[in-house]
Amino acid sequence: MDVDKQMLQWRKRAWLNSNQLYGELTDIIIKDTGFTSSFANLIDNSEVDSFSKNIVNIFTTANKTLPLIKDLIYNEFNTKVLAEGEGSILRGNSIVNKIEGAYVRLIGANYLRFVLSDLVTKVVLDSDLKLEIDPRKLNDYYEDKIEFEKKVAEVELRDNQKSLHNIAQQFLDRITDPSVVVEMPREIRAIADYTAESALRYAPESLAPLVGGFIMLRFFSPAIVTPEYSKLLSSEVAPSKRAKRNLVLLAKVLQNASNGVLFGGKEEFMTCMNDFIIGNKEKMSAYFNLICKDPLNQNNKWSDLEGVKSATTTTTILTPTNTTTSSNGSGGTTWAKPIVGGSKWLATTPSGNTPSPAISNASSAHNGKSNNTTNNNNNNNNNNNNNNNNNNNNNNNSNKTTTTATTISSNSWDVYIKNVQIQDLFDLHRIFDSYKEKIVNKIINTNNNNANNANNNNTNNINNKTAIRVIEILKELGPSPKTKTERKKKETDAAEEPTTSLQNGASMGSAFDECTHMLERSRFLFQGPNDKNDRSVFYLIVNRVKPEVFDNVNPLIAHIFKVMDICVNSPYTLVVDMSWAHISNDLKKAIFTHLPKLAEIFSRKYKKNIDKIFIVHPSAYTRAVIYFMSAFTSRKLKRKIHDIYNWKDLSQYIDIENIALPETSKDFITKSYRVVKVNSKGKRQERLIKFTSNSLLNIDPKTHRIQNEKRINEIDEITSRLGSIEINMKLSGESKKSGSILGTKIGFLSINNNNNNNNDDSNGNHDINESNSRKYICNHELERDHILQDIFETGFKMGLQSKSTKSLPTEYKVIKVNNVGKHQERIFKLTIDSLLNLDQQRIKSENSFAGIEEVILDPHDDDIVWLKFKSEPSRRKIICTVKGEGKLLLEVLTDAINKYQTTIDIQEGALKLDAEEGFL
């Protein structure tokens, strides 16, 4: 029977048990780094970046990234030296390079600032500093001069060469200073040591280029080139075009000094710095020797970082060949006196994460019968591997260093899984699901074919058991809820026929016109009626900005000039509408690539004359973009930015009838999905879908009434198809069987069943009498994926909550006291990101958790809570009608706001990393 590969099907177990299944999947890849490194080598180049960030986030939360990197480095040398030669090791965008880079940027951020901040700031602030040594770029470099006479240019070049030499020496002296090296995170030093150990054994002539390439290319150089994203500069300091070029030249010199490669070839103009490289060769050798030493453990290097007990650690000792000595000339095994204490600059967890206890390798019970079996087998296989390694020194290093059979106590595991970000799990699920056929063909089948090889038999057994269990977990989970992969810009077909220059000109002209028309039709930027002070008002609708807007920057610039240029000679207002905005990876990349260019192109009047910037319905993306733009704007401009959490608050500045926001933005409800619901009779109804911590709300966007609420555990099955925008759900129908319960307070919206069944849905039937199936038609495939992900995330968090001793309600009956003392009965209902204020089933107002400034319990009455919204001048008095629920409301709101803020911080941090990588 043929399998329909286009069909997507999920059963209730997938999301209700996602906590357990995702937990076991991450448990497997963390404890069996041999399998993980084997899988990593199956990843296509298109997935390398995503998988690297994903795996670093998951492993770092468990403090287990280092053993994986060790395996990957050893495997890189084992497989490539003989097959492809020394020149292929750790080159390009390999998985080991990407994981190394992501990891050291994560844990070394504070250390980078400690080492480089003062020097980089000095370079950026020195407006007279001239380091350009490329004769072809002198005219561009000196923006205030038109041209140079040859004689003057030669003098300038000599002066610049001398300055570049001096500044580069200052940087190198600072980086290699032993008192500075002491503060380097030991994790970074360990990676350098793994690289050096492998180089000594397999490629001794490449030791300096490999270690230098790691420490400079992956760590220091990116920070020097993009200091605004590495926080080497304060927020009010922005590098000029000249300063950026100076930093690039410095990074080039430092990079070549670190790997000992002399300039020449395509960069002939840099050969004047070869004396610098030669003169610092001994300094760099001493530096490499120093950073590759563990200051705490002489005999069991890095064992504590790898999660291995020192008493049982087997240390790999490599004897240098006759032609290889240590960098200080005294031999590779010479050690300095151990330095007590670790680096105070180490950052061990992603932004917003609480550090998890290290996952222990000690033997302990682990959840799941299959896991216990696997762990026991893995322990036996590990012992066999150790024996084989002791008896056969020629075995692969990866066998020695593979971390298997990591059993985890339930307490530490619960803490760990709570700190893993759900999007990382979705990405992990998507990537493993995409490569499940390769897991079968390349790992399971290959190991079976090699089963007769005695040297590999034990390792094969471990990898096979792990791989088989991964396939079983993927089957239980079903497809990843993140099915949509965003399309990359299509490359030009090499087979296309060449066009003549005349055709090219016509094509370029028509392409420009087509882009211009596309920009005009999208109406992502337009002018609205003036504000109350008769100032021009422009609207930027972020939801309408697509990645293709940036495909050709010239039409974009022309369009912005056309819309704004006439009016920006005098003060004006900019309204940035973030309603319904989703920033895709393609759009993020485009924004981070082109915004700096646009900031440089537009004249000073655009910045000077802007009076106010209103951010309507702000989000994590807003904060990240504002942070990103801070490098190109002034502190004065940032003071002009105002967050608007309710679009009607714009009426303080613009007459309400003149607010030109789209109607969909005025209907905006935080993280909702505007869909079409099709009932069993085929009737189509517009709906907003919104999630609470345990249910799905169906909201009529016209009346703002909650038509019904479906618990996540009432959804039995979900189906869709690849490329489809439809979601089909089968429901258990429990709500129909328990209609009487819905009138009671059980944490779900109390809906009376006394409606007249003769009325249709628009007259108040509220979707009560529907069949046990429903269909949603989304606007696009990505939106469908987001709904699926929210269902999985809700189920995941319900699984975490079920382990908690206390489950807080999400619905509260209250009396809201308005400004004039009037009492109003209301229901407060918490969604995943907002507080709904309900009059029966009608949503009177919604406040994002981001818009709540403070929550305070009344000191004299535990049933009174005071709420302060950022959009309102004073606190609101809230009286809980059920005795004792005041403290619960305070606790649940505080917890929800903190979790939401943590999520925002993590998203913002990820966007900042994207911005940094966009310029590497």
UniProtKB/Swiss-Prot annotation:
<feature type="domain" description="CRAL-TRIO">
    <location>
        <begin position="512"/>
        <end position="673"/>
    </location>
</feature>
<feature type="region of interest" description="Disordered">
    <location>
        <begin position="344"/>
        <end position="405"/>
    </location>
</feature>
<keyword id="KW-0343">GTPase activation</keyword>
<feature type="compositionally biased region" description="Polar residues">
    <location>
        <begin position="498"/>
        <end position="507"/>
    </location>
</feature>
<feature type="compositionally biased region" description="Polar residues">
    <location>
        <begin position="346"/>
        <end position="369"/>
    </location>
</feature>
<feature type="domain" description="Ras-GAP">
    <location>
        <begin position="63"/>
        <end position="291"/>
    </location>
</feature>
<feature type="compositionally biased region" description="Low complexity">
    <location>
        <begin position="370"/>
        <end position="405"/>
    </location>
</feature>
<dbReference type="GO" id="GO:0009898">
    <property type="term" value="C:cytoplasmic side of plasma membrane"/>
</dbReference>
<dbReference type="InterPro" id="IPR036865">
    <property type="entry name" value="CRAL-TRIO_dom_sf"/>
</dbReference>
<dbReference type="InterPro" id="IPR001251">
    <property type="entry name" value="CRAL-TRIO_dom"/>
</dbReference>
<protein>
    <recommendedName>
        <fullName>Neurofibromin-A</fullName>
    </recommendedName>
</protein>
<dbReference type="Pfam" id="PF00616">
    <property type="entry name" value="RasGAP"/>
</dbReference>
<feature type="site" description="Arginine finger; crucial for GTP hydrolysis by stabilizing the transition state">
    <location>
        <position position="91"/>
    </location>
</feature>
<comment type="function">
    <text>Regulator of the GTPase activity of Ras, mainly RasG and RasB.</text>
</comment>
<dbReference type="GO" id="GO:0005096">
    <property type="term" value="F:GTPase activator activity"/>
</dbReference>
<dbReference type="GO" id="GO:0033058">
    <property type="term" value="P:directional locomotion"/>
</dbReference>
<dbReference type="GO" id="GO:0046578">
    <property type="term" value="P:regulation of Ras protein signal transduction"/>
</dbReference>
<dbReference type="InterPro" id="IPR001936">
    <property type="entry name" value="RasGAP_dom"/>
</dbReference>
<dbReference type="InterPro" id="IPR039360">
    <property type="entry name" value="Ras_GTPase"/>
</dbReference>
<dbReference type="GO" id="GO:0050920">
    <property type="term" value="P:regulation of chemotaxis"/>
</dbReference>
<feature type="region of interest" description="Disordered">
    <location>
        <begin position="477"/>
        <end position="508"/>
    </location>
</feature>
<dbReference type="InterPro" id="IPR008936">
    <property type="entry name" value="Rho_GTPase_activation_prot"/>
</dbReference>
<dbReference type="GO" id="GO:0051896">
    <property type="term" value="P:regulation of phosphatidylinositol 3-kinase/protein kinase B signal transduction"/>
</dbReference>
<dbReference type="GO" id="GO:0030833">
    <property type="term" value="P:regulation of actin filament polymerization"/>
</dbReference>
<dbReference type="Pfam" id="PF13716">
    <property type="entry name" value="CRAL_TRIO_2"/>
</dbReference>
